[in-house]
């Protein structure tokens, strides 16, 4: 996908919707977008370092493609912000991590793991970085996407949701890639999957889920139409179970082993096979291939 494709998505209605959002919706929109921008910029910088330790040419190629796509995603977020708000508001949103302690802590958790790998460059820190990527791609991104899909189902910011759907398609493949790398390393490097090391990875996953739930309750809580703190918590715990079991380790939690009934709309909004066509663009947005990938996760 070309970067120019991003500007084919019509955000004129979003420009009108944004000032009319409820205060809680607008605050959540700004903070979640700020977090997603950080995650993509982090990935853009981290993936080239990871690729130095991957010897399989085809996997290396996938990592380079992913790094390129993360840059495209950052452009997409910039396009959204440039369209709906002033340059001053845009900069305020981009740099909220400087003034919002919750956002700074979110960034620090994943950033510290990457920094450890850059400093140590050993097998264990590499494994922890791969797990951190899996958490980032499979929990953090998906939880953020959920909010934008909720706005869209309430008839607001539909262009933003469409941008997110494009990004969601890419993240499906990134998630599949990191899962495949980890599963292959389970076979090739059994010393990296001793009970003690698996416990470290499990603790990372639990901490990622805990932080994401706390973040969701902070930015969404019970103040956004169509969502509440319990729905957010249940969905994120479900994602934690889905990701951990996808690595062959069973479930993290006894509850939320299936997708919550009141959150099935998330999958429907992100479902690549759900063909939607923008009347003005007359362009299909079905992505059958990426959905086939995510079904295995």
Predicted stretch roles:
Residues 49-61, 83-91, 117-130, 146-166, ...:
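Inter-helical turn/loop segments and adjacent helix faces that build the functional surface
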Residues 43, 49-118:
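Long, hydrophobic, well-ordered secondary-structure blocks that form the structural core
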Residues 65-83, 99-102, 109, 136-146, ...:
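Alpha-helical scaffold segments in carbohydrate-active enzymes
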Residues 190-297:
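Extended, helix-rich structural scaffolds rather than catalytic motifs
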Residues 24-53, 72-75, 126-151, 173-177:
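Alpha-helical bundle segments that constitute or directly flank the non-heme di-iron/ferroxidase center
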Residues 12-35, 52, 93-135, 152-158, ...:
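Acidic/His metal-coordination segments adjacent to aromatic residues that form catalytic metal sites
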């Amino acid at each position: 996908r070309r970067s120019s494709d991003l500007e084919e998505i019509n955000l004129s209605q979003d420009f009108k919707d944004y000032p009319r959002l409820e205060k809680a919706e607008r605050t959540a929109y700004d903070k979640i977008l700020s977090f997603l921008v950080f995650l993509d910029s982090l990935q853009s910088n981290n993936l080239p370092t990871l690729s130095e330790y991957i010897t399989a040419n085809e996997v290396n190629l996938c990592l380079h493609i992913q790094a390129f796509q993360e840059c495209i995603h950052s452009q997409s977020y910039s396009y959204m912000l440039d369209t709906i708000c002033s340059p001053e508001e845009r900069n305020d949103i981009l740099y909220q991590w400087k003034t919002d302690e919750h956002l700074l802590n979110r960034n620090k958790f994943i950033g510290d793991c990457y920094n450890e790998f850059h400093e140590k460059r050993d097998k264990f820190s590499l494994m922890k970085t791969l797990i951190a990527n899996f958490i980032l791609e499979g929990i953090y991104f998906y939880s953020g996407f959920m909010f934008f899909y909720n706005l869209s189902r309430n008839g607001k910011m539909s262009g933003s949701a469409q941008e997110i759907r494009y990004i969601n398609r890419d993240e499906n493949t990134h998630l599949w890639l990191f899962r495949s790398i980890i599963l292959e390393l389970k076979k090739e490097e059994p010393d990296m999957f001793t009970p003690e090391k698996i416990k470290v990875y499990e603790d990372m996953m639990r901490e990622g889920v805990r932080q994401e739930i706390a973040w969701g309750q902070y930015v969404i809580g019970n103040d956004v139409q169509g969502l509440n703190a319990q729905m957010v918590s249940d969905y994120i715990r479900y994602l934690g179970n889905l990701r951990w079991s996808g690595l062959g380790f069973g479930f993290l939690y006894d509850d939320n082993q299936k997708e919550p009934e009141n959150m099935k709309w998330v999958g429907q909004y992100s479902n690549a096979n759900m063909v939607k066509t923008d009347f003005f663009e007359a362009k299909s947005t079905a992505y059958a291939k990426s959905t086939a990938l995510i079904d295995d996760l």
